[in-house]
């Protein structure tokens, strides 16, 4: 096998060009086995195998610097740069992350995981090279929907100013996570149809040279094209037409489903762990589709991640024009929602916590200053969410809860979530965000009659004395567990509070607690600095009330173990009880 002998790019160059397809097949075989056991980004990597081989065959990495956008398609790159064992040996599968990481290899230049950044990052590398009078090629790889992001277009716009070596590989697989949307992709389709000869050419209009490669999964054709642009003296785009999921029939047929996979059976392509349990995505989709049937002003908006809201292809078709995918463009999604709301519509925007940070300015400026009554639901905003350092979901509380006018809610159950949606989608007074709980969805069958328009009214779920435990969202269950343990171990009947509101204080209730409580505990699924608990502590600052804030430390974590992180932050019922008894 060729792959077993490759310890770096120099070994790729030793293989004859007509033998490189064998290497490509070996890479796919290894990726297939690994993905079937470990899961990971599937389609993007299968489509980039030949291009990755060609890049390392032609260029001199790491002197020539290759920057991958999102870097979810960097598995073949890692296999060719000294990390093959992480893809060949099951015991080493976790030796590498799912994205590029400079701590792993000198061939990786950035830790990235968000989209549309490679052109700007690589342009910075090229600018520094020029300032220092150095040489070498700088290559940005982008595609798989990433061109719909504003930063990608900003980067392309700037790239033409460089007037020096800068190579942009556009991996055009005619897909994002789902299908592509927007006029830009109509131009890419036209270029594919005309073999790159169409007069209307986005890249040329930006002042960039342009090369088209129709056979983007033909390693010989790619090597020829890359050799032509190597050592170029001005920015050039190499537009390659690839097939997402190439080499595995189920992935070629169902590209959206196979963008990312969990463990599966190789023969059938069926998941090994098929989750049939109801979750917040399916609940959201069902709710919105029903609402759309009765109200034509309701619109569901996504920024390239439709299934986060449960909108699979069939559901998107059912929603018709009341479902909008703006591409991977969170800023536009939020601004669009504001415009819809101002003109009398009822916009719903669903977004991962990790991605909402990309549109902080629009939430603040376009929505909250204008007091636009949008509904924005935050998914995976939890320590139980995605655990890659680039996709952490526990920074949204400090980020969103301190924006004026925004009402940020935290349900603990399905029923509370649906009640919040009922209120938010019909009210016209506030911008509303809802932070969904992490972990399995809890449904207790209760009927929630609370009027969420009466802002900042907490709910006392259990009346006690001496100690009050306020459990926000995900950690309301932890609050109940800690209270139960306190009763069992110390005979203390604690008050348990579900606050619902992240953005405001129930000052009347907090004041009342002073009468027969001396300790207040806050539990939140997010970082403590600037978070919910600090607001409670500040309220009690001049009093004798002891306040104990529990949440996460401000730090970047990567591929962490949830239980270990919870214990490290004393976020277990046993630790909370031990702490409070130690100061009582």
Which residues make up each language-model segment?
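N-terminal amphipathic, basic-rich helices that act as targeting or association modules
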Residues: 1-79, 215
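Glycine/charged-rich beta-loop-alpha catalytic/anionic-binding loops adjacent to active sites
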Residues: 29-36, 95-111, 133-139, 312-327, ...
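Active-site nucleophile and cofactor-binding loops and adjacent substrate-binding regions
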Residues: 39-48, 67-72, 101-120, 142-146, ...
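Cofactor-binding active-site loop characterized by glycine-rich and histidine/acidic residues
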Residues: 41-162, 298, 303, 312-313, ...
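Glycine-rich ThDP/TPP pyrophosphate-binding loop and its adjacent helix/strand module
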Residues: 73, 108-264, 270-277, 282-284, ...
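A glycine-rich helix N-cap at a beta->alpha junction
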Residues: 86-96, 161-175, 368-380
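Non-catalytic terminal/interface segments that mediate subunit docking, oligomerization
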Residues: 248-357, 362-372, 470-473
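Peripheral docking tails and interdomain loops at the edges
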Residues: 263, 269-274, 385-387, 398, ...
């Amino acid at each position: 096998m060729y792959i077993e002998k490759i310890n770096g790019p120099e070994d790729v160059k030793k293989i004859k060009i007509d033998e490189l397809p064998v290497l490509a097949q070996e890479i796919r075989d290894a990726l297939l086995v690994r993905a079937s056991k470990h899961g990971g980004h599937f389609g993007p990597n299968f489509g980039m195998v030949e291009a990755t081989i060609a890049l390392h065959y032609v260029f001199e990495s790491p002197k020539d610097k290759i920057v991958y956008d999102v870097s979810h398609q960097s598995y073949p790159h890692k296999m060719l740069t000294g990390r093959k064992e992480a893809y060949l040996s099951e015991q080493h599968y976790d030796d590498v992350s799912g994205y590029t990481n400079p701590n792993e290899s000198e061939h990786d230049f950035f830790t990235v995981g968000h989209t549309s950044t490679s052109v700007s990052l690589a342009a910075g590398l090229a600018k520094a090279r020029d300032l220092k009078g150095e040489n070498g090629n700088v290559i940005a790889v982008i595609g798989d929907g990433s061109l719909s992001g504003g930063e990608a277009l900003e980067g392309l716009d700037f790239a033409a100013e460089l007037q020096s070596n800068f190579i942009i590989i556009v991996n055009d697989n005619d897909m994002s996570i789902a299908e592509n949307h927007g006029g830009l992709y109509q131009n890419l389709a036209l270029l594919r149809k005309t073999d790159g000869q169409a007069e209307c050419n986005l890249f040329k209009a930006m002042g960039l040279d342009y090369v088209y490669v129709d056979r983007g999964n033909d390693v010989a054709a790619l090597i020829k094209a890359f050799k032509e642009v190597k050592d170029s003296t001005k920015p050039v785009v190499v537009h390659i037409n690839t097939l997402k999921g190439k080499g595995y029939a189920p992935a070629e047929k169902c590209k959206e489903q196979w963008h990312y996979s969990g463990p599966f059976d190789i023969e059938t392509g069926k998941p090994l762990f098929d989750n049939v349990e109801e979750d917040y995505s399916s609940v959201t989709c069902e709710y919105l589709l029903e609402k759309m049937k009765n109200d034509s002003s309701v619109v569901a908006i996504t920024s390239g991640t439709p299934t986060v809201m449960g909108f699979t292809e069939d559901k998107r078709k059912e929603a018709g024009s009341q479902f909008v995918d703006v591409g991977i463009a969170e800023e536009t999604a939020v601004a669009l929602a504001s415009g819809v709301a101002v003109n009398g519509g009822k916009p719903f925007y669903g977004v991962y916590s990790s991605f909402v940070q990309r549109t902080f300015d629009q939430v603040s400026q376009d929505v909250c200053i204008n007091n636009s009554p949008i509904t924005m639901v935050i998914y995976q905003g939890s320590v139980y969410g995605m655990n890659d350092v680039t996709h952490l979901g526990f920074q949204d509380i400090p980020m969103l809860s301190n924006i004026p006018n925004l009402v940020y809610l935290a349900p603990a159950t399905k029923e509370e979530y649906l009640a919040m949606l009922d209120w938010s989608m019909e009210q016209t007074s506030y911008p509303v965000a809802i932070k969904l709980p992490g972990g399995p969805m809890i449904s207790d069958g209760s009927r929630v009659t609370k009027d969420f328009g009466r802002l900042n009214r907490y709910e006392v779920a259990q009346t006690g004395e001496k100690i009050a435990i306020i459990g926000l969202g995900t950690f309301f269950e932890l609050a109940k567990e800690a209270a139960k343990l306190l009763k069992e171990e110390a005979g203390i009947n604690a008050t348990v509070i579900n606050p619902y509101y992240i953005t405001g204080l129930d000052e009347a209730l907090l004041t009342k607690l002073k009468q027969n409580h001396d300790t207040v505990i806050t539990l939140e699924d997010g970082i403590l600095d600037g978070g919910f608990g600090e607001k409670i502590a500040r309220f009690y600052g001049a009093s004798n009330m002891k306040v104990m804030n529990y949440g996460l430390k401000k730090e970047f974590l990567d591929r962490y173990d949830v239980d270990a992180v919870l214990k490290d932050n004393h976020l277990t019922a046993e630790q909370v009880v031990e702490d409070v008894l130690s100061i009582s």
